[in-house]
Amino acid sequence: MDLDVFVTAHRAEWDRLDALLGRQRRLTGAEADELVALYQRTATHLSLIQSSAPDPQLTGRLSQLVARARSAVTGTRRASWRDVTRFLAHGFPAAVYRSRHWWVPTALLSTLVAALLGWWIGTHPEVQATIAAPSELRELTRPGGQYETYYSSHPAASFAAQVWTNNAWAAALCLILGVFLGLPVLWILFQNMLNLGVGFGLMSSAGRLDTFLGLVLPHGLLELTAVFVAAGTGLRLGWTLIDPGPRTRRIALAEEGRAAIGMAIGLALVLFVSGAIEGFVTPSGLPTWARITIGVVAELAFLAYVYVLGGRAARAGETGDLDAAERSAAVPTAA
């Protein structure tokens, strides 16, 4: 395509569309119809230029023109309760379900790493000595020690809010940093598993493994699952850069990135639940079996939510991405 000839042939249409968009007064019916027609044609022109003769300056101008025209034609779309319901019932669980081949292996391998670290620390006193002095370790692991009082030393509401904020930020980092080929995600995962392994090893070496499990399992099952989902999705996003499949790398990254943003919101809600459990249930006076039961029920409910609702939505074609009309990266074309 001869770009100069193309621009000469259609410049008048683009200028006319720009003029209509700049009108201060309300458009007449005929002008509104003209605006819609020019919007469709300009969107088609933009698509042609992007595919056959990309020119950064011209593409930028037409992209802005099409965006302004789209806003004028469709109006600014506001999120509704229907959108929220659709996201929670279809979009988010489907996105988690679609990523299961990444986060389930991530969860299994990470748990294995934490268990091995815990065994290594618990059976090697010389390793424990590098963590803290013997007196400090005794203070940490004794009945009523720092490990137990950590969950009850602050008001439940403020502690739950702090935990939720920290965990939501960690999950968001896993999703965001996935674009760096997943390497930062692996480091975040290792840090989390190391912390878990240290607690496991020290408490088991002190003969208090039952106390450790009673403190970690109520909130930890759901919390760690959310972290594993975020990490697995981040790794998937990183792999998309390496192997985008049948899609172009740009389109694949845009689609997976938008889905990841939605997952960050959904996982923040999941972590809110685990944070509430950690703040109010874990330090409560409930029997250990009751606290663990609450954690198991919350975990099973989340898995059912993902595999039942999410699986059904995914099989129906839901991906967790935005609707086509809402994708800023998509360019409408004339029918």
Annotate each PLM feature.
Residues 1-85:
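Soluble N-terminal domains of membrane-associated systems
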Residues 197-288, 292, 297-299:
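Hydrophobic alpha-helical transmembrane segments and adjacent short intramembrane/lumenal linkers
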Residues 316-335:
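Short, highly charged, low-complexity non-transmembrane loops/tails of multi-pass membrane proteins
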Residues 89, 130-173, 196, 204-206, ...:
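Interfacial loop/helix-cap signal at membrane boundaries in integral membrane proteins
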Residues 63, 119-145, 190:
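Interfacial/capping segments of alpha-helical transmembrane domains
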Residues 83-100, 149-150, 154, 158, ...:
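Cytosolic juxtamembrane amphipathic/interface segments immediately preceding
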